[in-house]
Design a protein with these regions (language model features):
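Hydrophobic transmembrane alpha-helices
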Residues: 2-10, 14-75
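Membrane-helix interfacial "entry" motifs
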Residues: 2-9, 31, 35, 39, ...
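Alpha-helical transmembrane segments and their immediate juxtamembrane flanks
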Residues: 3, 8-17, 21-22, 28, ...
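Hydrophobic alpha-helical transmembrane segments
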Residues: 14-15, 40-45, 70, 85-89, ...
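Membrane-water interface at transmembrane helix exits
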Residues: 25-32, 53, 58, 95, ...
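Alpha-helical membrane segments and adjacent membrane-interface helices in multi-pass membrane proteins
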Residues: 54, 58-118
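Short helix-perturbing small/polar motifs within transmembrane alpha-helices
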Residues: 114-159
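A structural signal for small-residue-enriched, beta-sheet-centric alpha/beta enzyme cores
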Residues: 148-177
Length: 177
């Protein structure tokens, strides 16, 4: 789900920009070190697909946020976590700048919530443990389902924690916001 700028304070937004920027730098370095011939074209094609799929938004009433299909886990399974994080960061940046999906202040939060949790938590701790390289259609299906649910729930938890850290809630009187 994309966070709107109204959900976070400038301090939290700035901190998450710094965290996400640091992750982008680390991922770019890792991708450069392990570059394969077909990686960049795959990143481009899959990025375009995820961009189109994520443009189908579902409004979340009363929050100013929207939810959509999450492409982070699919990218991670197909590209690996470092390349996937770079692609999802690129997709989210284009969506924020050109389509006002999310907000510029919240872009760091959105990159972290939609990129970090699927690529670096759900994929290694759920998908790889369940699928385990042993194959089998049911095992892969169960691993993908479990990791997708974990990634989405962790992303939603990230939104809650970032909003809480900002001191913005529905119970806050509007004069204080």
């Amino acid at each position: 789900m994309h966070m709107a700028d109204a959900l976070i304070s400038p301090a939290v937004g700035g901190a998450m920009w710094a965290v996400s920027g640091g992750l982008i730098a680390v991922c770019a370095r890792k991708v450069k070190q392990t570059m394969r011939d077909n990686l960049v074209p795959m990143m481009g094609v899959l990025g375009a697909f995820i961009f189109a799929a994520q443009m189908i938004n579902f409004s979340i009433p009363g929050t100013g946020s929207s939810g959509h299909l999450g492409g982070g886990l699919l990218l991670t399974v197909l590209l690996g976590p470092y390349a996937a994080f770079l692609v999802i960061a690129s997709v989210l940046t284009v969506q924020a700048f050109f389509f006002a999906d999310g907000g510029l202040l919240a872009l760091g939060c959105n990159i972290f919530n939609l990129g970090f949790f699927p690529a670096f938590v759900a994929y290694p701790l759920v998908y790889r443990m369940v699928a385990g390289g042993r194959g089998g259609a049911f095992r892969n299906w169960a691993a993908a389902l479990g990791a997708a649910v974990a990634g989405l729930l962790l992303g939603a938890l990230g939104v809650v924690l970032e909003t809480l850290a900002s001191g913005i809630s529905r119970t806050t009187p509007s004069a204080q916001i």
